[in-house]
Amino acid sequence: MTEFKLTIIIDFMRQLLGLLAWLSKPVLGLMFLLCTFLAEAQHSNIRITNVATSNGSWSLSGSTYIFTATGDNANLNVTDLQNYLRTNSVEIKTSRAAGTQVGSVVFDVGVSVTKNSSSGSAFVFTISSGGEVQFNASMSLRNSVYTNYPGYNVVVTAGGSVRIGGVLDVSGYSNADGYTSLPSPGSVSMVVGGDLTVLGAGQVLSRGINNTYQYLSGSSGGVGGLQSYVVSGGIDLQVGSVLNAGGGNGFATQSYVTTGGVGGAISLSGVNGVLLRGSIQSVGGSGYQGGVGGALTISSSASYVDYGGVLSSQGGNAFNANYQAGNGGNISLSGFGGLSIRSDVNAGVGAIGLSVTGGNISLSDGNGVLTTGGGVNDGQVGGLLRGNNVTKLGVGVLGIGGANAYTGTTTVSAGKLYVLQAESIPNLSALSLSASTILDMGGVSESVGSLAGSGKVTSSVSGEVLLTVGSDNTTTSYSGMMEDGLGVLRVSKSGTGTWSVSGANTYSGLTQVSGGGVLSIGSSSGLGSVSAGTEVSSGASLELYGGISVGAEPLSLLGIGRSSIGALRNLSGVNAYAGAITVGSGVRVNSNAGSLSLTAASVFTGSNASMLFGGAGILSVGGVVSLGSGAITHDGTGSVYLLADNVYSGLTRVSGNGTLRVGSSGALGSNSSGVEVIGSGVLELVGGISVLGESLSLAGYGNGVVGGFRNVSGNNVWSGTVSLTGNAGLGSGSGKLSLTGSPAIAASSFGLRIYGVVGSSVELVGEALYTGQTELVSGSLLLGADERIANASSVMFNGGNLSTSGYTETVGELSLYAASSISLGSGVHSLRFSSAGVYDFKLLTINGWQGVYGTPGSSGTAGKVYVGTSAVLTRERLDQMRFYNATGPATHYCLQLSDGELV
């Protein structure tokens, strides 16, 4: 009947609203509120006191006793409530069809119950309220000593606000009686339609038990119970308030290795502002192995989170420093409308015991700007963060300050992380900036373990700031941008790892590389603007990759780089560097692959500094090298090009399997110390130059088919003396190499191979005094004057050509191993071989002979060729020689006259 009447009333009010549509807005609002009140007032208030129960009754539904109001202002006697709670689950309900009140539930007296049942399931104390719920006194709902039996779960569903002014305790009970499995604590779950307020004297406890039983393996601490608060309004934890779900302590016994209890998770989720001035803790219990801290999650979906109390999910302590401390639990703070952290956030490991891993800290901030007024939405971390990883979420600005002690990574997934104080991020923390995020240095310096990601680094405050990256010695890649902002940003790469930077940086401060690590740049502006330059300390390296062209950035180099890879190294690609480079003694520069072109007018400058070049790629030095008395050594397998007139007086050395190309007459510096080429090393000349007075020590046949000393392009002159320190090769791949020294080749017993291609030649203008064999492999050996080759040097024709150029020459034994040729010049001259050596049934062609062809026995009239001093060649050997008549044209067989002449 009552419900029918209510329906009639509501329908009447709706019709009335329609008739009064022309009324003012205040009248309409009043009508709406009246309608809403009539629809929601189907509740009665219930108060828990010491007075006898009235206006309410008990009923049993399944295994749950339900107290329901039968009239408004119902009263529930606390003793009645306790008796029911002691044996079964209980629910208090305010809903009543005929009720005219909002349905509040108020606890004016304390409730204390010890579960007196061996039920294996937790009892549930449910409060279903249409209005607010007030805990004005304490409530203790705990399990008895029965083994492994859970206690009470408190479930509150309130249509209005919840206020906690006493102690709500559902913690585990003592294990003094020695049960091997621990009684579990209860849990607390609240869904609040209004605000949640925990007064200064208010506490919610769901702690695990402290185990006091010392003989059995059940001596470990109890786990903490869960606490969950879902609030449609705001949350206010006042100074002195406590939420505690910590794990219990294990018994300190030597008989068993006990474990501290794991902390229970605590979750606070509000829609409006969350003001935290109390204590929220879920610390792991102590034991020979500390317990893990519980997870703490605090959020506001539409407003701020302002924390200024105690927040700890620290792991438990170990009883003994030789055992493992507990891991910290994760902590998450999320304020859609802003986040302020005024006190420490502790997700660290236990203070005693072997170090393990702290919990992760997630900070989600919605501040549009960072303020400094100390308001609830200032976006600042004023306390210290202790734990493992810290993650910045949310699109807002979050300021971090203080000497934070978390040990894991720092991740900015969204928004801006603002550095309030110098070194606020732990030095070993790996920093990762997601796309479109910002690290704002705030006018102070910061050191991080590493930097990865693609966000931006800047400073919104004036002054010089230093960003130091690399102390965790890892390898990371960063594609974001580093800029000055309003300050001047300096960047320092420390540690032994590799930091790859590929963004378009614009910062104007100095770049430093130290600590044995590598700064690898894949952008032409990877080092910022060119104004302040870059310094590479001994043991560290600067790398280039990706086809970049660095501007006129001054560069200072020391040492040979990390693991001898070079203080400056081309990693890959065709790259260029236009800055002047200052070097200390012993600096190494390598081109690992690809090519590196150094294009400054003055490339290398050092005070009596020697340099090392290496790698398998190409290093092109286009400007002047000024090293004082320093030397240059190329020991790589690639090529080094010296293209300018250089200023140094030390030895130039080519070893390994590499090539040193000289493109300027003065590229090898002064001629006081000379050049040394050994092994498979190569010295190349290009461009039609004349290298004056430079001595060359040569051993080996080079790394190709044209010798260890070779002409590459143009007609080039070497006026110094070549000394053979081993059997060696020289040649010309194109053009002519003229040896004009006095002597051209110094005396030795080693042999010389001559290489070349068709149309190229090596010219002996000066004397060749070596007595070892002269082997003509390919190309042409030209005589530049009479008697250039030592008489004792035998000649092996192995595919090459000997051109007299009209000069007389006397040499040792003639051997024939491959089809070869002799070219005679014009004018009267002779080429004399002392005797005949090995003939390998190959053809030796003599070009340019002048005489009567077709008349056997007719001596030559200009150039003549002799083998021995009598007719020593057999018919078989003579048949391996031919005269080529270019005017015939025809090829003629060879005869030998009695004086040894071949005709």
Model feature map: region roles:
Residues 25-36:
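Bacterial N-terminal signal peptides
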Residues 43-207, 229, 235-239, 352-354, ...:
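Extracellular beta-helix/beta-solenoid repeat scaffolds
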Residues 92, 127, 156, 188-190, ...:
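Residue-level detector of buried hydrophobic side-chain packing
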Residues 93-94, 127, 392, 402, ...:
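Beta-strand-rich, repetitive solenoid scaffolds
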Residues 1-23:
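N-terminal secretory signal peptides that target proteins for export/translocation
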Residues 9-10, 14-16, 38-83, 326-401, ...:
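Extracellular/surface-exposed low-complexity segments
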Residues 135, 164-171, 237, 281-283, ...:
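Surface-exposed loop/turn positions within long extracellular repeat scaffolds
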